[in-house]
Every structure is written in C-alpha cells, then in structure tokens.
A protein has these predicted regions:
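Short, flexible active-site loops
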Residues: 32-42, 84-97
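Pocket-edge structural micro-motifs
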Residues: 23-26, 84, 131, 159-161
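Short beta-strand-initiation
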Residues: 4-7, 67-69, 124-126, 144, ...
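Internal nucleotide-binding/catalytic subdomain
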Residues: 1-70, 74-77
Length: 165
C-alpha cells in the first residue's frame, strides 16, 4: 500500500475569489468506503503544509465557486497524490455542522450568493462516523445503539432517511 495517510481538505471559494479552508481531516476507509473523518488530523506540520499547498493549487485550477472537497494520499516519501476532487459539499465534511463555527453547507450558500465566507475554525476536536445500512435493506431506518450514542455528552446523530442501503 502506498498511502500512509489520507488527508481531507475542505475549502470554499467565494464569487470575489476569497478562499476559506477548514482544518485538515483524516479520512479513514474500510473496504474503500468512508468510515470516519477525524479532525484535526494527527499529522506533522510539514505534511500539513504540503497537502495544504496541493489543495490550494487544485482550487486555483478548478476556478470554481462554492465548496470543494480535496481528498489525497500522502506516501511514505511525502509525495502527494490527489485522489478525489468533489466540487460540492461532501459527506467527509458533515463534521462541520457541529464541529466548526460555520458549516460547509452555510459557506457553500454564502459563496454562491456573494456573501462573505464564514469562520471555518474548529470548535472542538470532532469525529464523523459514516453509518451505512445493511446491503440491500429497504424500509424504515433503525440505528442500533442510538439511545446510548445520544446519551453521550456532545454527540449528535444525523439520520438522512435514505430508503435503500
């Protein structure tokens, strides 16, 4: 495996060209499917700066307006490989709803309607866990352990009500 780290950058570009960048996150995958995003990522300053430079270059190349998610691999020899660029709010950034001063959704709207971008600062360390239903399940959503999770101080659960897994 070439990757030692899968950093995630969320950035938003406004109509006037201002760019707001969220704290770097660490995406963790199981069987190539996002399992969790941990913010802030536990990485060294040099790797963070290199990945941040790569994310900014991607933003310049795309020259778009609104939210962008840039996922990348950083190899053992610190080579940066872009894995995905999503020009939209992204499931990796759902942590921003409670974890940051301004969510990715609010900043996306601000950007496309010409309002100043909001503060992207992290309020507190945050983990977003991607809950997926059993393959082939259809019908009402049931989350095992929901009561226990909701009893945790600071925990929030978002259930999107998709009809089919």
């Amino acid at each position: 495996m070439i990757s030692v780290w899968k950093p995630l950058f969320l950035a938003c570009r406004s109509l006037n060209g201002d760019v707001a960048v969220y704290p770097v996150g660490d995406n963790r995958h199981i069987d190539s499917i996002l399992h969790e995003t941990v913010v802030p990522a536990d990485i060294d300053k040099t790797a963070t700066e290199g990945a941040m430079d790569a994310a900014k270059k991607v933003m310049e190349i795309f020259d778009g307006i609104g939210m962008f998610c840039v996922e990348m691999f950083v190899t053992e020899d610190d080579q940066i490989l872009i894995n995905e660029v999503a020009p939209r709010p992204h499931n990796s950034g759902h942590y921003t709803i409670e974890g940051c001063v301004t969510s990715q959704f609010e900043n996306h709207i601000r950007a496309i309607v010409g309002l100043p971008l909001g503060d992207t600062s992290l309020i507190r360390p945050t983990v977003m866990v991607n809950l997926l239903g059993e393959e082939g399940h259809s019908g009402k959503t049931y989350v095992e352990g929901l009561y226990d999770v909701c009893a945790l101080k600071g925990a929030t659960v978002h259930i999107y009500g998709k009809g089919v897994s």
